[in-house]
Regions:
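Residues at the C-termini of beta-strands that transition into short coil/loop
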Residues: 23, 88-91, 141
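Short acidic-hydrophobic surface loop/beta-edge motif
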Residues: 11-12, 70-75, 162-163
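A short, structured surface patch at a secondary-structure boundary
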Residues: 102-165
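Short, intrinsically disordered, charge-balanced linker/junction segments flanking boundaries
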Residues: 1, 164-169
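Flexible, Lys/Arg-rich cytosolic regulatory linkers and terminal tails that connect or flank
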Residues: 1-38
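A short, polar/charged loop-to-alpha-helix boundary motif
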Residues: 92-103
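A hydrophobic, helix-centered structural microdomain
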Residues: 28-94, 129
Length: 169
Protein backbone atom coordinates (compact mmCIF):
# COMPACT_ATOMS: atom_id res chain seq x y z
CA UNK A 1 0.00 0.00 0.00
CA UNK A 2 1.21 3.47 -0.90
CA UNK A 3 1.00 4.91 2.60
CA UNK A 4 2.82 1.93 4.10
CA UNK A 5 5.72 2.14 1.66
CA UNK A 6 6.06 5.93 1.94
CA UNK A 7 5.86 5.91 5.73
CA UNK A 8 8.33 3.05 6.05
CA UNK A 9 5.73 0.93 7.87
CA UNK A 10 5.83 -1.75 5.16
CA UNK A 11 9.12 -3.54 4.57
CA UNK A 12 9.93 -4.19 0.95
CA UNK A 13 12.97 -6.27 1.75
CA UNK A 14 14.47 -8.09 4.69
CA UNK A 15 18.30 -8.14 4.83
CA UNK A 16 18.41 -7.67 1.06
CA UNK A 17 15.86 -10.38 0.28
CA UNK A 18 12.70 -9.06 -1.43
CA UNK A 19 9.42 -9.40 0.43
CA UNK A 20 7.46 -8.36 -2.65
CA UNK A 21 8.01 -9.81 -6.07
CA UNK A 22 6.59 -8.98 -9.45
CA UNK A 23 6.20 -11.74 -11.98
CA UNK A 24 5.49 -10.03 -15.24
CA UNK A 25 5.31 -12.44 -18.09
CA UNK A 26 3.88 -10.78 -21.17
CA UNK A 27 0.50 -12.03 -22.27
CA UNK A 28 0.06 -13.61 -25.66
CA UNK A 29 -1.85 -11.43 -28.15
CA UNK A 30 -4.96 -13.62 -27.82
CA UNK A 31 -4.83 -13.27 -24.02
CA UNK A 32 -4.49 -9.47 -24.27
CA UNK A 33 -7.38 -9.30 -26.75
CA UNK A 34 -9.56 -11.58 -24.62
CA UNK A 35 -8.84 -9.52 -21.52
CA UNK A 36 -9.64 -6.29 -23.38
CA UNK A 37 -12.91 -7.72 -24.73
CA UNK A 38 -13.85 -8.81 -21.20
CA UNK A 39 -12.97 -5.33 -19.90
CA UNK A 40 -15.18 -3.69 -22.53
CA UNK A 41 -18.10 -6.07 -22.05
CA UNK A 42 -18.09 -6.08 -18.26
CA UNK A 43 -17.53 -2.32 -17.87
CA UNK A 44 -20.25 -1.49 -20.43
CA UNK A 45 -22.67 -3.85 -18.67
CA UNK A 46 -21.72 -2.43 -15.26
CA UNK A 47 -22.27 1.15 -16.42
CA UNK A 48 -25.62 0.20 -17.94
CA UNK A 49 -26.85 -1.78 -14.93
CA UNK A 50 -25.53 0.72 -12.40
CA UNK A 51 -26.74 3.81 -14.27
CA UNK A 52 -29.70 4.44 -11.89
CA UNK A 53 -27.34 4.29 -8.90
CA UNK A 54 -24.76 6.45 -10.71
CA UNK A 55 -27.43 9.10 -11.36
CA UNK A 56 -28.58 9.10 -7.72
CA UNK A 57 -25.01 9.38 -6.42
CA UNK A 58 -24.23 12.17 -8.91
CA UNK A 59 -27.35 14.06 -7.83
CA UNK A 60 -26.49 13.70 -4.11
CA UNK A 61 -22.89 14.86 -4.65
CA UNK A 62 -24.05 17.88 -6.68
CA UNK A 63 -26.58 18.79 -3.95
CA UNK A 64 -23.69 18.67 -1.47
CA UNK A 65 -22.12 21.53 -3.45
CA UNK A 66 -19.78 21.38 -6.43
CA UNK A 67 -19.41 19.03 -9.38
CA UNK A 68 -20.34 15.36 -9.17
CA UNK A 69 -17.12 14.10 -10.71
CA UNK A 70 -13.48 14.48 -9.81
CA UNK A 71 -10.72 13.97 -12.37
CA UNK A 72 -7.14 13.43 -11.34
CA UNK A 73 -3.97 12.63 -13.28
CA UNK A 74 -2.67 9.14 -12.64
CA UNK A 75 0.10 7.06 -14.19
CA UNK A 76 -0.97 4.18 -16.39
CA UNK A 77 0.75 1.66 -18.60
CA UNK A 78 4.23 2.81 -19.70
CA UNK A 79 3.87 5.61 -17.08
CA UNK A 80 1.58 7.55 -19.40
CA UNK A 81 -0.75 9.96 -17.64
CA UNK A 82 -4.51 9.68 -17.85
CA UNK A 83 -7.41 11.26 -15.99
CA UNK A 84 -9.03 8.90 -13.51
CA UNK A 85 -12.73 9.56 -12.97
CA UNK A 86 -14.32 9.35 -9.52
CA UNK A 87 -17.28 10.79 -7.69
CA UNK A 88 -16.07 13.82 -5.74
CA UNK A 89 -15.69 12.93 -2.06
CA UNK A 90 -13.65 15.91 -0.85
CA UNK A 91 -14.33 19.61 -0.50
CA UNK A 92 -13.42 21.77 -3.48
CA UNK A 93 -9.75 22.85 -3.40
CA UNK A 94 -8.84 20.06 -0.98
CA UNK A 95 -5.34 19.79 -2.44
CA UNK A 96 -4.64 23.47 -2.97
CA UNK A 97 -1.57 23.05 -0.72
CA UNK A 98 -0.29 20.18 -2.88
CA UNK A 99 -0.76 16.41 -3.06
CA UNK A 100 -1.59 14.70 0.22
CA UNK A 101 -2.57 11.16 1.13
CA UNK A 102 -5.96 10.94 2.78
CA UNK A 103 -6.98 9.08 5.90
CA UNK A 104 -10.31 7.93 7.32
CA UNK A 105 -10.66 11.01 9.53
CA UNK A 106 -9.38 13.46 6.90
CA UNK A 107 -11.24 16.78 7.38
CA UNK A 108 -11.11 17.38 3.61
CA UNK A 109 -13.63 14.56 3.07
CA UNK A 110 -17.27 15.67 2.91
CA UNK A 111 -20.04 13.97 4.88
CA UNK A 112 -21.43 12.30 1.77
CA UNK A 113 -17.85 11.57 0.72
CA UNK A 114 -17.34 9.44 3.84
CA UNK A 115 -20.37 7.37 2.91
CA UNK A 116 -19.22 7.03 -0.71
CA UNK A 117 -15.74 5.95 0.36
CA UNK A 118 -17.02 3.51 2.98
CA UNK A 119 -18.98 1.60 0.33
CA UNK A 120 -16.49 2.36 -2.49
CA UNK A 121 -19.22 4.12 -4.48
CA UNK A 122 -16.77 6.91 -5.34
CA UNK A 123 -14.88 4.37 -7.49
CA UNK A 124 -17.82 3.37 -9.74
CA UNK A 125 -17.10 5.98 -12.46
CA UNK A 126 -13.79 4.17 -13.09
CA UNK A 127 -15.76 1.69 -15.19
CA UNK A 128 -15.66 4.53 -17.75
CA UNK A 129 -11.84 4.50 -17.55
CA UNK A 130 -11.96 0.75 -18.22
CA UNK A 131 -14.34 1.20 -21.16
CA UNK A 132 -12.10 3.85 -22.74
CA UNK A 133 -8.98 1.71 -22.30
CA UNK A 134 -7.14 3.79 -19.69
CA UNK A 135 -7.63 1.06 -17.09
CA UNK A 136 -8.49 -2.62 -16.85
CA UNK A 137 -10.78 -4.41 -14.42
CA UNK A 138 -7.82 -6.28 -12.95
CA UNK A 139 -4.45 -4.67 -12.40
CA UNK A 140 -2.44 -2.61 -9.94
CA UNK A 141 -4.03 0.60 -8.69
CA UNK A 142 -2.82 3.66 -10.62
CA UNK A 143 -0.90 6.18 -8.56
CA UNK A 144 -0.27 9.90 -8.85
CA UNK A 145 3.16 10.85 -10.22
CA UNK A 146 4.05 12.71 -7.01
CA UNK A 147 3.64 9.59 -4.86
CA UNK A 148 4.94 7.18 -7.50
CA UNK A 149 8.24 9.11 -7.54
CA UNK A 150 8.51 8.74 -3.76
CA UNK A 151 7.75 5.02 -3.96
CA UNK A 152 10.39 4.55 -6.68
CA UNK A 153 13.01 6.10 -4.38
CA UNK A 154 12.29 3.47 -1.72
CA UNK A 155 11.35 0.57 -4.01
CA UNK A 156 12.99 0.81 -7.46
CA UNK A 157 11.22 -2.44 -8.45
CA UNK A 158 7.98 -0.44 -8.48
CA UNK A 159 8.86 0.68 -12.03
CA UNK A 160 7.73 -2.76 -13.24
CA UNK A 161 4.17 -1.80 -12.41
CA UNK A 162 4.12 0.33 -15.56
CA UNK A 163 4.43 -2.77 -17.74
CA UNK A 164 0.77 -3.58 -17.17
CA UNK A 165 -2.52 -1.73 -17.45
CA UNK A 166 -3.69 -0.29 -14.11
CA UNK A 167 -6.91 -1.70 -12.75
CA UNK A 168 -9.91 -1.10 -10.55
CA UNK A 169 -8.98 -4.15 -8.43
Amino acid sequence: DTYGILSGMVDIDEHGLPLMEWHLEPMDPWQRNTKRLADIGISALALLCLSPLLLVVAFVVIRDGGPAFFRQERLGKHARTFKILKFRSMHMGAESAGPQLSSEEDPRITGIGRFLRKYRLDELPQFWNVLTGDMSLVGPRPERAYFADQILEKAPQYRHIYKVQPGIT
